[in-house]
Amino acid sequence: MTSKGNAGNPPTPTPAPVKSQPLWHNLVSGGIAGVSEILVMYPLDVVKTRQQLQVGKGQSMMSSLVTMVRHDGLKMYRGIVPPILVEAPKRAIKFASNKFYEKQILSYCGNTKPTQMQAIGSGVLAGITEAFIVVPFELVKIRLQAKENAGKYTSTMDCVNKTFRAEGLSGFFKGLESTIWRHACWNGGYFGLIHTIKSALPKPTTEQGVLVNNFIAGGLAGTFGTMLNTPADVVKSRIQNQVGAGKYNWCIPSILTVAREEGFSALYKGFLPKVLRLGPGGGILLVVNEFVMKLLAGKN
């Protein structure tokens, strides 16, 4: 379709509208991105969890990593089954629900591109949605990763069975509220910054440039999200590692307890391995997600 030009001038072509991809594209691309990220970054997740569960002064990240490699070897991948099982649906839900909420917000507000506040809002809503899916898997993963539980559980299914016998079905949802805080903060920070960072970067002229920009934007946004959500993640790990009633219950009171008893810095235990995982991990997520989205768009 073309618009009429002035006399003697050729008509100006009307740009074709950008076709929105179906929701299942976001589900597939997000799932593949999530599994890719967890396979590469999982050892740092184990170190992060062990540091968060330490009360008082503990090992540094490098000491923890060296000790884990020396003593555990491939057993450092203990607990990877729950995140692998949940990673595809979790990341699929992260990207698909963010896109869904973004469309709803844009439709309600009447604009075509999200403002930063709208991007934060859709990210927070996506994080809340994601939290309900991941919490049982997170609980099993935390208990398998905890150093003090090394001889307690023989496998993922053994942990599931013992948790169910001791705490019932509701036991798998321990830490739901702190998980909501963790995911809402990270997703709000991540999706809220991506568009801003991309617009600040030089416009790419090649496919390689697009990949580099996506990695930079995802990495910086992932780092910011990690800075926001680490206190909630610390108390979530402690809440979920407790069998039965314990010292830590709700997110905000538990954050205040940790800060009072161990100092403010304790709320950022495990931050270095976490940010080393989720900073580059955020870049991997965005690069793989957008790459798969393009592949799927090409097939249609």
UniProtKB/Swiss-Prot annotation:
Entries under PANTHER family matching the protein: MITOCHONDRIAL 2-OXODICARBOXYLATE CARRIER
InterPro entries: Mit_carrier, Mito_2-oxodicarb_carrier, Mitochondrial_sb/sol_carrier, Mt_carrier_dom_sf
Location in or out of the cell: Mitochondrion inner membrane
Name of encoding gene: mcfT
Primary localization class, coarse: mitochondrion
Catalytic reaction equation(s): 2-oxoadipate(in) + 2-oxoglutarate(out) = 2-oxoadipate(out) + 2-oxoglutarate(in); hexanedioate(in) + 2-oxoglutarate(out) = hexanedioate(out) + 2-oxoglutarate(in); L-2-aminoadipate(in) + 2-oxoglutarate(out) = L-2-aminoadipate(out) + 2-oxoglutarate(in); glutarate(in) + 2-oxoglutarate(out) = glutarate(out) + 2-oxoglutarate(in)
Single GO MF descriptor: antiporter activity
Identification of the protein by name: Probable mitochondrial 2-oxodicarboxylate carrier
Region of interest: Disordered: 1-20
Repeat among keywords: yes
Residue stretches of each Solcar repeat: 21-104, 114-200, 209-295
Topology of the protein relative to the lipid bilayer: Multi-pass membrane protein
Tree of life domain: Eukaryota
GO CC term, one of those recorded: mitochondrial inner membrane
UniProt entry tagged with the keyword Transmembrane helix: yes
